[in-house]
Design a protein with these regions (language model features):
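Ser/Thr/Pro/Gly-rich low-complexity disordered regions
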Residues: 17, 21-221
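Extracellular/periplasmic catalytic domains that process cell-envelope and extracellular macromolecules
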Residues: 97-99, 188, 222-224, 268-271, ...
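Structured segments of extracytoplasmic/periplasmic soluble domains
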Residues: 250-259, 339, 343, 360-363
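Metalloprotease/metallohydrolase-associated module, dominated by Zn2+-dependent proteases
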Residues: 293-295, 299, 303-304, 311-313, ...
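Metzincin-family zinc-dependent endopeptidase catalytic domain
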Residues: 243-330
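N-terminal export and membrane-targeting signals
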Residues: 1-21
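Fold-level signature of zinc-dependent metallopeptidase catalytic domains
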Residues: 220-244
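Active-site recognition of the HExxH zinc-binding catalytic motif
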Residues: 325-343
Length: 400
């Protein structure tokens, strides 16, 4: 055999031998024929970082491996089982993961398609996520008694469809006020109102946010006229006069009363546009022969409250189980209504609220007892001069 030469060259998977001028090809997996493969070894495992709660994104490192030059693929596991489609280096936690532990499985591959696999340690069990307020709730509407306010729930991330409302008066929950709108009540007068929105979404903790408070709630309409009056008594008075004065003024100030017609009332020491009288029953007829010792009356500038009725209401009122305080509201509103120019009204229909200008002390003809003016009764005298009783009623006597 003649002298020969041997050359070795690595070209991908091909090793060429030349002996005595002859070419003999050979295929070897990844290395020259006879050479051993270098094993893939995980030196340190993958590490998952991020908050383990719904809606958050967790990420994994590939870990440390030998040899160098490896490529990596990822798969996320829920309690050790693969999560369909979760094959990125990061993973956004879903509602289905709630209560489960997550881990990341990393597969390393070399140039010869040799692989190695390592898995991170588990996260703690996934907790419920938190809802973020992108735009706080807001309130629209006029902050006046008997006006309706409406709530906008604001914007949340992620988006929510389930929201609940609780209206608050000066920070305290208003009983039963749990809808998206709220009709301002007499109790709201002078108070600031807001609404608290609670947002809910599956897999998330409830989120709460409050709207900016309204300004102090005002009366239904602006003050159009302030009327002054003073208080007198007639006959033997056994009722507490200070209480009478206080409760009468409370009736005048109440948002449900004549104040909703734009009328304000101010008590003065003497004089004024009219006189509110607390009279012993036997004294009432002295104002006019038309007046009765049984009922209250209005004669000219005198708005006369019968002391017996003030202390005990009327048989019809008591038979209906209504309160003495409501009767007092009614009788002051009724007699003052005469001074304002209102006459008597009848029942508008069975089961409906009685007008305050109906003679409710005597009965209601099927209407419901009512101490406050109806909306239809809240009118001002055409002259607009409400500092005194309209002239065409000055001489009239009303018995109630």
């Amino acid at each position: 055999m003649g002298i020969g030469t041997r050359t070795v060259r690595r070209l991908g998977l091909r090793v060429a031998l030349t002996i005595l001028g002859l070419l003999a090809p050979a295929l070897v997996s990844g290395v020259a024929a006879g050479a051993a493969l270098e094993p893939i070894v995980n030196v340190s495992p993958p590490v998952v970082s991020g908050l383990a709660q719904v809606g958050e994104r967790v990420r994994t490192t590939p870990g440390d491996w030998t040899p160098a030059g490896l490529t990596f693929t990822y798969r996320w596991l829920r309690d050790g089982s693969p999560i369909a489609g979760a094959t990125s280096r990061s993973y956004k936690i879903r509602v289905e993961d709630l209560g489960s532990a997550l881990s990341a499985e990393v597969t390393a591959t070399d140039a010869t398609d040799q692989t190695g696999t390592a898995t991170s340690g588990p996260t703690r069990p996934v907790r419920r996520g938190t809802l973020d307020v992108l735009q706080r709730p807001s309130i629209s509407g006029v902050a006046r008694y008997d006006h309706r306010l409406s709530a906008d729930p604001g914007r949340w991330a992620p988006k929510v469809k389930n929201v609940r409302y609780q209206w608050l008066r000066s920070g305290d929950p208003i009983a039963g006020a749990t809808k998206a709108s709220y009709l301002l009540a007499p109790e709201d007068l002078g108070e600031r109102v807001t609404v608290e929105v609670t947002a809910r979404r599956d897999g998330y903790l409830p989120g709460t946010a409050r709207a900016k408070r309204t300004k102090a709630v005002d009366h239904r309409v602006p003050l159009r006229r302030m009327v002054s009056y003073h208080v007198e008594t007639r006959g033997k008075i056994t009722a507490d006069l200070a209480t009478f004065k206080r409760l009468a003024q409370e009736t005048y100030d109440d948002a449900r009363g004549w104040r909703s017609a734009g009328m304000g009332f101010k008590r003065v020491a003497k004089g004024g546009a009219f006189t509110l009288v607390l009279a012993q029953a036997s004294w009432v007829p002295r104002f006019s022969s038309v007046c009765s010792a049984e009922w209250s009356c209005r004669v000219g500038r005198f708005v006369i409250i019968n002391q017996t009725r003030w202390l005990h209401a009327s048989p019809a009122w008591n038979a209906a189980g209504r309160s003495l305080r409501d009767y007092r509201n009614m009788v002051v509103n009724h007699e003052t209504g005469h001074w304002l120019g209102h006459g008597h009204l009848g029942c508008p229909g069975p089961g409906k609220l009685a007008p305050v200008m109906m003679q409710q002390s005597k009965g209601t003809d099927g209407c419901k007892l009512n101490p406050w003016p109806l909306r239809s009764e809240l009118w001002a005298h055409p002259s607009g001069k409400l500092s005194q009783a309209p002239a065409d009623h000055d001489a009239r006597v009303w018995v109630d």
